[in-house]
Structures are given as structure tokens and as C-alpha cells.
Amino acid sequence: MLMPRQNCEVFRQLFVNDTPLMDMRAPIEFAQGAFPTSINHPLMEDEERKAVGTCYKAHGQDAAIALGHQLVNGDIKAARLAQWKAFAEENPNGYLYCFRGGLRSRITQQWLKEAGIDYPMVVGGYKALRRFLIETIDTVAQQPMTIVGGNTGSGKTIMVNELANGIDLEGAANHRGSSFGRYVTAQRTQIDFENVLAVEMLKKQAQGCTHFVFEDEGRAIGSASVPLSINAAMGNADVAIVDDPLDVRIDRLIDDYVVRMQRDYIAQNGEQQGWELFTEYLERGMFGIRKRLGMKRYEELLAAQKQAIATQKSNGTLAEHDNWLRPLLIEYYDPMYTYQLSKKADRIVFRGNYQEVKSWLADK
């Protein structure tokens, strides 16, 4: 039997402790943005919510509530209640929420109570939780930070994940920010990106972090935008530069963009389709920068890429990927980053190889 608990009005520990959350909103609302530990078990499905909303506008709250009870009744109500009971019993430390902590939360609580379960809700609902996370991001933006920069393949993302005070923007966005930046899984929505980012910040704060390290990023990471307050703070922060040799950087890129992506596509889609999707992924990445390469050079590097993939598929060797990655770095990515870095020259406070920069940042 679940012991009665108070409704939740203090949100920090909810996120720091990865507290399970049951989201009562409709699937369309959930898809637009939710929280890392939330599961959608809606009171109403999309069409039901739409019908109730239309009724509310035309006839008022009482009529809308009556329609809601009519739509969610009998077997439908029993099935949803069974889902909620299972969640509550599996997650005795969890909470439920709707958009504002209003009618949907109270009805769910009431039905659960009638079934013998006293389950608490989040006061203020999704809206209050979301506001708290946005405020967290803005608070971190006001704290000391250092940016780790360096040419493509310098291991910046690896480094921020290895540092106790590192914040992985690309991980939060589920995108690596370049033309080749997508993962096998879909990129997060803007809201989900911000929510995941804020939760990571809360956890770092709980560990005592007061100085944060971010990877040098532009405003856009794939289709996501770095929150304005963080982007502005990064634009004024000290910069530490990783200067690693070209061969080391190419090895990292082969591991990240070739070995990992091929493995992940096959794991998700099977051997044949996995190879097809992996090939399409690399070719789309090259296609995305064709105008900057110029069509002649694009076609040459695409041919080298296709040959490297064919050899990899034939005998498992990876060496031929050097034939397109090396010129891509020398001719495109390195000059582009050199130009971007020239605008930050007055903020560079440290340079070194990967281990030197990591050790220096670890003392922050």
C-alpha cells in the first residue's frame, strides 16, 4: 500500500533525483516537450481533448467536464486507470502533473483515490516545472564559465563529458552541430533540449559546481538553438583551445562518424538496411556542404567517400576514410574554424593538447 505524500511544490530535488513523473497531458502536448523522467499516460487522447476544448469555448466549463466524463468512461476509463495504478505502484516516489496542475491532475487523483491509491501531484503542473528549468538556465548563464574550443576532431565533446563541471550542449540537443551531426535517433525538440540541459545543470549544481565548461558552439545545434542567455554568456567567456595533430583528429572522427554510426545504424535496422542508412547519412553530410566545397571538389570527395564505404563494407578496413576526411578538414573545416576563432582571439586564456587543456580545466 502506498503511503500518502504531500503534493510537490519544490522542484529542484525532483530533477536532481530523477523522480518518475506521470504526464497527464494529451500526446500532442507531450510530443512538443516534456521532462527526461516523464511518461505520458494521458487523461484524454488528442481528439478527446480537442472535443472538450471546443465544448468549453461554446458551452462553458460544466458542459466540458460532463463531455470529458462521457468520453472517458467504461472500458476506456478502466484501461487508463489501470495504467495509472501500475505507474503509481511501480514508482511510489513519483508524482503526476498536467499543464497547470488543475482539473486534469485533480480528476486523475480522484479516480486513483477511488481505486485505493493516494498519489501526489506537482503543484502548478508542467508550466511551473518548465518555468523553473528556464530560470535554472538563466541562473547558470550568470555564473563563471570557460569555453573549450579547437578544430573539428579535437575531442571537445568528449572532454566536456569527462569534466565534472562540463555541460554537453550537443548531448542535450542529440546533435553534433555539423553537417554530419545527426545521430541514429531523432534530434530533440527545442523544449526537450532546454529541459534536458537544465536538468544537467541542476545535477552539476547539486555536486557543488559553480564554474561551468561548455564546448564552443554557435547559436544553432542542428535544428535547436542554444538558449539566448547561455549563448550571450558564452560570447563573453574565456576560451581554452585544444591543439591536437591532424592525424589524431582524423582518428577521432573515424571513430565517431564512421565506426560508431555504422554500428548504431546496423544495431537499430539490421545489417542490410543499416548499411544503406549509414551510407545515406555520410552522403547527406557531404551534400550539406557541397556549395561551400564547390561542385567539382564535392564530387571528388563524394567519390572518395563512396569508395571508402565500399571498402569498409567489403573487408572492414577503415583507412580509406582518410581520403575524404583529411581534405575535408584541411580545405573546409579548419579554415572555417580559424576564421571563427580569430573573432575570439582576445578571450583565449590557454592552449595545449587534449590532456593539457583537460587538466587545466579540471582545476576550474
Curated annotation (Swiss-Prot):
Protein origin, superkingdom: Bacteria
Active site: C98
Annotated Rhodanese domain residues: 15-138
Catalytic activity: 5-methylaminomethyl-2-thiouridine(34) in tRNA + selenophosphate + (2E)-geranyl diphosphate + H2O + H(+) = 5-methylaminomethyl-2-selenouridine(34) in tRNA + (2E)-thiogeraniol + phosphate + diphosphate; 5-methylaminomethyl-2-thiouridine(34) in tRNA + (2E)-geranyl diphosphate = 5-methylaminomethyl-S-(2E)-geranyl-thiouridine(34) in tRNA + diphosphate; 5-methylaminomethyl-S-(2E)-geranyl-thiouridine(34) in tRNA + selenophosphate + H(+) = 5-methylaminomethyl-2-(Se-phospho)selenouridine(34) in tRNA + (2E)-thiogeraniol; 5-methylaminomethyl-2-(Se-phospho)selenouridine(34) in tRNA + H2O = 5-methylaminomethyl-2-selenouridine(34) in tRNA + phosphate
GO molecular function: transferase activity, transferring alkyl or aryl (other than methyl) groups; tRNA 2-selenouridine synthase activity
SUPFAM superfamilies: Rhodanese/Cell cycle control phosphatase (SSF52821)
UniProt-listed Gene3D superfamilies: Rhodanese-like domain (3.40.250.10)
EC number annotated for this UniProt entry: 2.9.1.3
Key words, A-Z: Selenium, Transferase
A GO BP annotation: tRNA wobble uridine modification
Self-association state and partner proteins as the record states: Monomer.
Family label: Belongs to the SelU family.
HAMAP family named among the record's database cross-references: tRNA_sel_U_synth (MF_01622)
Described function: Involved in the post-transcriptional modification of the uridine at the wobble position (U34) of tRNA(Lys), tRNA(Glu) and tRNA(Gln). Catalyzes the conversion of 2-thiouridine (S2U-RNA) to 2-selenouridine (Se2U-RNA). Acts in a two-step process involving geranylation of 2-thiouridine (S2U) to S-geranyl-2-thiouridine (geS2U) and subsequent selenation of the latter derivative to 2-selenouridine (Se2U) in the tRNA chain.
UniProt-recorded name of the protein: tRNA 2-selenouridine synthase
Lineage: Bacteria, Pseudomonadati, Pseudomonadota, Gammaproteobacteria, Vibrionales
